[in-house]
Amino acid sequence: MLFYEKLEVSVAKLNKANLKKTLYYLQRNGLRETWISVRERLTETDRYFFVPCSEAELVRQSDRKWEKPITFSIVVPLYRTPEAYLNRMITSVMQQSYPHWELILADATEDHSVEEVLMQQGFLKEQPTDGETEPVAADPRLHYVHLKENAGIAANTNQALPYAKGEYIGLLDHDDVLTPDALYEMADAIIKAYDRGVKVAFAYSDEDKCDGEETRYYEPNYKEEFNYDLILSNNYICHFLVMESKLLKSLQFRPEFDGAQDYDLVLRCVAEVLTEGGQTAEKRILHIPKVLYHWRCHEASTAANPNSKKYAYDAGMRALQDHADRRHIPATATETRHVGFYRLKYKEVWEARPDVAAVGGRVLSGKNGKIIGGRMTAAGAVFYEGLPKGFGGYLHRAELSQDAEALDLRCIRIQPSCQEVFEKIVGVPYTEIRRHPGEQPVFDVTVLPLGADIRTLSLQLSEALRQRGRLLYLPEYPEEFKPL
């Protein structure tokens, strides 16, 4: 392919990736960072195809008899919701294969335009009352409330909570869509957890995005099992979220965090769970590894245009700082180069995070600057392996702080109280160096004997350290050198 042909393909691909995002990124981060980001976007391939649940499977789910069914209240704050999106959102709930739900619509629109649309679509009907008529739901599982004023999304949602009678409350935006099996999968997972003796505090699923017409699905967000330090970097939990009704009603949404009210809620719920039982209580936070939610992208949505709700990202950073302050973590919440992604900066990590046994950074090849080590699975697979320096990787996760199952010995720092564990397993005294001025210290890997099995030692050490605390992957600990 000739150069100008390659350029034409690249420009077309960039347009699809949303030119507005690129221009906004340029304003925030400058030309060099934008060039690196554009290069990364142009290497990505969009091979995602959403595969819906089959009709046969939906029938099987509908026919299932539940001995002790979980009841859900789906809460949706409405405000000037476009007619087509409103219809599709409600229909996506009505078509659930799981029957034990109710849908609560809290309408803050100043006039009765949304109410009239609901009448026209058959979701509401008029009922005579004392010589007058008032709107009532055509389906007894649907509850419509017209709020007196638009007090903001947090306050509007709070006003809907007293109407929720379910054991769990699910959060759905007024222009988004649930998959038909969403509540079935949630109920099934929560009941299985209960059978294991676990009372789920909240559960979340994977999600993707769709265009305004739901003709294209893209950018799937395949999430991890609960990862504390990842949620301190980004609200990766997001959609679809269901939370214990009692817990959500006690916490409620806080209007001062409008735009990031979901993130603030999740952070406060996480704090409740951790206060209750530390890391062992994290099993009360459940991940369902299946796309159950379509986040609709259109001109006004945050998903399509980050600049449309910049206040939301500012509120997210304030929510993170509030979480750190409430948990007495001496740290400062800061932005990263990606909107909606944050970092807690610790002056001294051991003072701030006594729950952490070790921190580790990425290991870069001295030859071409690609990731060759850092965060690993318990089996030794390297996360983000081969990713060039400067690239953020899938959903920017290579640049985000997160808990790890294993860390690479070549870029690790050990909590002082755990250093005897290091010496017992690695077989050499633990010594630290600063490879570059201004950087945090790391283990001096040069004291290892020539030919040491780095991978095996890393995995053995990590397994032992996990019994003492978290293993924290901090991508701001980069070290460039040739592999031993």
PLM region spans:
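Conserved nucleotide-sugar donor-binding catalytic segment
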Residues: 227-318, 408-409, 423-430, 445-452
